[in-house]
Swiss-Prot record:
Gene designation: AFP
Reported function: Binds copper, nickel, and fatty acids as well as, and bilirubin less well than, serum albumin.
Locations listed in the record: Secreted
Disulfide bonds: C99-C114, C113-C124, C148-C193, C192-C201, C224-C270, C269-C277, C289-C303, C302-C314, C385-C394, C417-C463, C462-C473, C486-C502, C501-C512, C539-C584, C583-C592
One matching Pfam family: Serum_albumin
Known glycosylation sites: N197, N251
Species of the source: Bos taurus
Primary localization: secreted
Stated family: Belongs to the ALB/AFP/VDB family.
Signal peptide: 1-18
Name of the featured protein: Alpha-fetoprotein
Subunit structure comment from the entry: Dimeric and trimeric forms have been found in addition to the monomeric form.
Length: 610
């Protein structure tokens, strides 16, 4: 499962102090420089992405005009020492272009943002981005004859329009990913236009691109939401874990350097600073390739690729390198005789970063949240042992207990895969449906179905892997699914239990949701017979439509009585299945449902006490 779609990202530049830090708190030099220039980059494409993501409802013509106007400013010589293409604050210039005339802000509901200045204006525009606005129609279907003709007449215009269509539908998607996908699209158009069956060629090729877009967009939303909710400290811990697993042979100083810059790049990406993120990502990738001898043997082929976009994609998806030889299996007595509680806040953070590095490079196949749970447990252990009479003995005993975090996740993975093998994907989804309707009955039926479909699909993917990969796969997918449930909660609060799980601790989100049982604050709606009356149309549908109808019934039932026991549920489902079988075999199907249905509803209400 992809965790970080790219180390290189978006394109606005230099929002006030974004380039001022070239060393971290421990004096480690940054790989990045402070050049605010845009020479050699696809500024038209980047500016199109920015305006389409910031003003999602704008037409292509409106976006193109804003691009033209702002590039005139950027590419004009300033008269200072900076050459054309250099601008100290490109973010401000781009936002000013949107706000320059009243027509665009008023037309698209951005007047409030334009009434603000500086970072407040920037934050307002970011808050207006919507993942799936109802005002934007579905992605236009590619019609081979028209598309091939348009591409041949003006290739640059055709591709830039494609960039616009992607960006407005995916407002948090990193610009380099959009440019990379547009580059893939640019390659398949001439190929498919010459194909014997152009329609089939386009359908096949575009499907894979669409899948990549969807996954990347969801991932970028997740990353930015985690950074926004839990702050830079948590995000740096995530990055330490991931980079240490990717490059376990690298020393701690090298990891610190990469973590500092990668975290900075993601921060700029999530702000929408496209040019800086794009250029900084290229610099980081170039640096990684220049240091491959000390970082990883797995990236040699990646570093031979012709473009930075291809190179970056390859490095991110490369296998983690092998652990160094002679590395002890455990991180025992990490602090030696030092008293953790006597350390300064800075030294505590540094010590925990080093522990996370050492633990991650020894456990390159564990999911990031599991390692962070171990690190959190280790810090709690150190704090507790500092108060004991024999800190060293306390620490030795406590380190064995850290395995419980791995064992809990292993037990869950084993149990989930056991259910998948026993039930199959559809019935596994039904089990998740019951559980999550109890945890979050405020979610709509489509939301519950979509959520649990992803969970069941994760079982289908992860449970077919080798046992040593199932755990990381399952935890990784669960982290993303729960992350998007938390984004939904942020937009429209669900209930106190969900809020507690989403906000208290990033690393503990999945265990928190696993421990939720029933939302005790939920008050079921008055019972409605209409939700439980069946008609003969149920006898005429098959496959997915029939499964969906049954799942809707299941959701309605649990929402009516969230405390329903497994035995009660099995009885009610069996009774209604019997009704379906009886009436669908009857010559008078509708009459059967009309006569038998109400009696069964009464029986069910009495049994459940609703």
């Amino acid at each position: 499962m992809k965790w970080v779609v790219s180390f290189f990202l978006l394109f606005l530049l230099n929002f006030s102090d974004s380039r001022t830090m070239h060393k971290n708190a421990y004096g480690i030099d940054s790989i990045l420089d402070s050049s605010p220039c845009s020479s050699g980059t696809n500024l038209v494409g980047l500016a199109t992405i920015f305006f389409a993501q910031s003003v999602q409802g704008a037409t292509y013509e409106e976006v193109s005009q804003m691009v033209k106007d702002v590039l005139t400013i950027i590419e004009k010589p300033t008269g200072s020492k900076q050459p054309a293409g250099c601008l100290e604050n490109q973010v401000s210039a781009f936002l000013e272009e949107i706000c320059r005339e009243k027509e665009i802000p008023e037309k698209y509901g951005l007047s409030d943002c334009c009434s603000r200045t500086g970072e407040e204006r920037h934050d307002c525009f970011l808050a207006h981005k919507k993942a799936a606005p109802a005002s934007i129609p579905p992605f236009p279907v590619l019609e081979p004859v028209t598309s091939c003709k348009s591409y041949k007449e003006n290739r640059e215009l055709f591709i830039n329009r494609y960039i616009y269509e992607i960006a407005r539908r995916h407002p948090v998607l990193y610009a380099p990913t959009i440019l990379s996908v547009a580059n893939q699209y640019n390659k398949i158009i001439p190929h498919c236009c010459k194909a014997e069956n152009a329609t089939e060629c386009f359908e096949t090729k575009v499907t894979s691109i669409t899948k990549e877009l969807r996954e990347s967009s969801l991932l970028n939303q997740h990353i930015c939401a985690v950074m926004g909710k839990f702050g830079p400290r948590t995000f740096r811990a995530i990055t330490v874990t991931k980079v240490s697993q990717k490059f376990p042979k690298a020393n701690f100083t090298e990891i610190q350097k990469l973590v500092m810059d990668v975290a900075h790049i993601h921060e700029e990406c999530c702000k929408g600073n496209v040019l800086e993120c794009l250029q900084d990502g290229e610099r980081v990738m170039s640096y990684i390739c220049s240091q491959q001898d000390i970082l990883s043997r797995q990236i040699a082929e990646c570093c031979k690729l012709p473009t930075t976009l291809e190179l970056g994609h390859c490095i991110i998806h490369a296998e983690n390198d092998d652990k160094p030889e002679g590395l002890s299996p455990n991180v025992n007595r990490f602090l030696g005789d030092r008293d953790f509680n006597q350390l300064s806040s800075r030294d505590k953070d540094l010590s925990m970063a080093r522990f996370t590095y050492e633990y991650s490079r020894r456990h390159t196949k564990l999911a990031v949240p599991i390692i962070l749970r171990v690190a959190k447990g280790y810090q709690e252990l150190l704090e507790k042992c500092s108060q004991s009479e024999n800190p060293s003995e306390c620490q030795d005993k406590g380190e064995e207990e850290l395995e419980k975090y791995i064992q809990e996740s292993q037990a869950l993975a084993k149990r989930s895969c056991g259910l998948f093998q026993k039930l199959g994907e559809y019935y596994l989804q039904n089990a998740f449906l019951v559980a999550y309707t109890k945890k979050a009955p405020q979610l709509t039926s489509p939301e519950l179905m979509a959520l649990t479909r992803k969970m069941a699909n994760a079982g289908a993917i992860c449970c077919h892997l080798s046992e040593d990969k199932q755990l990381a796969c399952g935890e990784g997918v669960a982290d993303l699914i729960i992350g998007h449930l938390c984004i939904r909660h942020e937009e429209n609060p669900i209930n106190p239990g969900v809020d507690q799980c989403c906000t208290s601790s990033y690393s503990n989100r999945r265990p928190c949701f696993s421990s939720l049982v029933v939302d005790e604050t939920y008050v079921p709606p008055p019972f409605s017979d209409d939700k439980f009356i069946f008609h003969k149309d149920l006898c005429q549908v098959q496959g997915v439509p029939l499964q969906t109808m049954k799942q809707q019934f299941l959701i309605n039932l649990v929402k009516q009585k969230p405390q329903i026991t497994e035995e009660q549920l099995e009885t009610v489902v069996a009774d209604f299945s019997g009704l379906l079988e009886k009436c669908c075999q009857s010559q008078e199907q509708e009459v059967c449902f009309t006569e038998e249905g109400p009696a069964l509803i009464s029986k069910t209400r009495a049994a459940l006490g609703v």
